[in-house]
Swiss-Prot record:
Subunit comment: Homooctamer.
Cofactor annotation remark: Binds 1 Fe cation per subunit.
NCBIfam families the record matches: sulfide-dependent adenosine diphosphate thiazole synthase
Top-tier EC class: transferase
Subcellular localization(s) per the UniProt record: Plastid, Chloroplast
Protein name, UniProt field: Thiamine thiazole synthase 1, chloroplastic
Organism: Sorghum bicolor (Sorghum)
Molecular function as annotated in GO: cysteine-dependent adenosine diphosphate thiazole synthase activity; iron ion binding
Tagged with keyword NAD: yes
Residues of the transit peptide: 1-43
């Protein structure tokens, strides 16, 4: 194992200057096998007193500080211009929002902007329950893990366990951000919705730190992002939670936000997927925010519903955009984790009356 590790290091992109090998004579040890002792030679050519690389003269390529500033600024501003009028805005980059973005981004013609108020996307999906590491995923959502290439322990017939929730979150986030049609705006908060003629048409944004300090500062007007579809995946109630549906109630587009009920895992996950829908024209609600608007039970530290709800929201958005989708069967190949009954659960008559 030591030889393999050393060989991998020597073949890596580690950018030091390799020193000459300091090969020592093989050592001899006596090994007892229960019978006559035998002598085994151990090579020490890999492990020497000198390190394999010398970094005393290491040097990066030179760069001007202004170039760094210009690269960051130009690219970010280009993204803001591109997504000032975009196809889909996803509000919240938790497990449901990222799953939605992953599914949407498979269509390279759909431009997707993800707005996340935290510096670090992922929501509550970096850990399991009570700050533990493992992520429990009920079947058949494990098929989504298979699609992503996330390893898991086949713990039982009904569920699987990912050894650390961060494995899922980092994998799906990396896959999403690698797609050229997706941009993540983290540390950006959504302060309001754009509504025209009874239809949600985008979001009102601001730097998250500015949003948190409106009471102490003035003259901090927001920015806007127009979108053909807004997907609200803001999570359950809290300081920054369920903000999409709460704003709909404030402006009279829905009657009430009853809040989620007490925990019932079996009822909750099915309900969240089944009730993921376009709640008002132009706005789809996914993830735990669904439980808030429908008074469904909370589900606790299981994550399968977040993944499938996010995927379903993506196909509802594709339908709204007039693109091939799984809801009306116009897409030839669907992620195997999307069960037919979950897709069929989304009906036009589920739209909440304004």
């Amino acid at each position: 194992m030591a030889t393999t590790a050393a060989s991998s290091l020597l073949k890596s992109s580690f950018a030091g200057s390799r020193l000459p090998s300091a090969t020592r004579a093989p050592s001899s040890v006596v090994v007892s096998t229960g019978g006559a002792p035998r002598t085994a030679a151990i090579s020490a050519s890999i492990s020497s007193s000198n390190p394999p690389y010398d970094l005393t003269s290491f040097k990066f390529s030179p760069i001007k500080e202004s170039i760094v500033s210009r690269e960051m600024t130009r690219r970010y501003m280009t993204d803001m211009i591109t997504h000032a009028d975009t196809d889909v805005v996803i509000v919240g980059a938790g497990s449901a929002g990222l799953s939605c973005a992953y599914e949407l981004s498979k269509d390279p013609t759909v431009r997707v902007a993800i707005v996340e108020q935290s510096v670090s996307p992922g929501g509550g999906a970096w850990l399991g329950g009570q700050l533990f590491s493992a992520m429990v995923v009920r079947k058949p959502a494990h098929l989504f893990l298979d699609e992503l290439g996330v390893a898991y322990d086949e713990a039982a017939d009904d569920y699987v366990v990912v050894k650390h929730a961060a494995l899922f979150t980092s994998t799906v986030m990396s896959a999403v951000l690698a797609r050229p049609n997706v941009k993540l705006f983290n540390a950006v908060a959504v302060e309001d919705l754009i509504v025209k003629g009874g239809r949600v048409g985008g979001v009102v944004t601001n730097w998250a730190l500015v949003s948190m300090n409106h009471d102490t500062q003035s003259c901090m007007d927001p920015n806007v992002m127009e979108a053909k579809v807004v997907v609200s995946s803001c999570g359950h109630d809290g300081p920054f939670g369920a903000t999409g549906v709460k704003r709909l109630q404030d402006i009279g587009m829905i009657a009430a936000v009853p809040g989620m009920k007490a925990l019932d895992m079996n009822a909750a996950e099915d309900a969240i997927v089944r009730l993921t829908r376009e709640v008002v024209p132009g706005m789809i609600v996914t993830g735990m925010e669904v439980a808030e608007i429908d008074g469904a039970p909370r589900m606790g530290p299981t994550f399968g519903a977040m993944m499938i709800s996010g995927q379903k929201a993506a196909h509802l958005a594709l339908k709204a955009l007039g693109r091939p989708n799984a809801v009306d069967g116009t897409i030839p190949k669907v992620s195997p984790a999307l069960r037919e009954e979950f897709v069929i659960a989304s009906k036009d008559d589920e739209v909440v009356d304004a």
